[in-house]
Amino acid sequence: MRSAISVVGVCAFLVCGCAVLPSSLQAQSAKATPLILEKNEGERRVWRPIEGAKIWDAVPGPFMFKVDRHNGGSSHLVFATEDLPRGAKIDRHKHPGADEIIFLQNGTARVNLGSRTREVHGGATLFAPANTWIEVTNIGAETIHGVFVFSAPGFDDFMRAESVPGRQKVVPLTKAEDAAIQAKHAHAVIYKEP
């Protein structure tokens, strides 16, 4: 009898307690637009290189926002895809205000995550809790296609500031412009250890 009451109580909690979203989530959900996107659909952008960088210091390839505040209206997460050409690297960085998940669809990468370094392959999932240093280098023979998710917005604003829409001419950033963008978005990403 006691277990039957417990099961009923748990079910009632799940149905009544968890089914009700906090008012902020309800408001966000009302403003968000459901999306169904194919691989090539989304907001395509290209990173701007830093002026004076050598060609082999190239930034990662193009990326595409799929879901964020500007695409679908989500105010609680960022979901995007990015290509990492052979030899390219996502520099060592951390995100103070958000967890990050990266899923590598293919290829081979060397990952420095926190205090660990490991070689990973297509199908690997990387989880970087907020404030965890991460660096990803494509050490394979093919372009890596990756997917990343942030648990909170912020880094997407930095990415837009350091990139241009996919078909727009790419003009390098000066070192001063890059420094100003990084300072403005320090709440979202830090590229240099203190």
Regions found by a protein language model. Give the residues of each.
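Bacterial N-terminal signal peptides
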Residues: 8-19
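Short acidic-glycine-tyrosine-enriched beta hairpin
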Residues: 115-131
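A short, N-terminal "cap"/entry segment at the start of jelly-roll beta-barrel domains
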Residues: 21-76, 164-194
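Positively charged n-region of N-terminal signal peptides that target proteins for export
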Residues: 1-4
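Ligand-binding loop in jelly-roll beta-barrel domains
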Residues: 73-74, 110, 130-156
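Conserved short histidine dyad/triad with adjacent acidic residue
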Residues: 63-68, 80-95
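Glycine- and acidic-residue-biased ligand/ion/polar-headgroup-sensing regions
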Residues: 97-109, 114
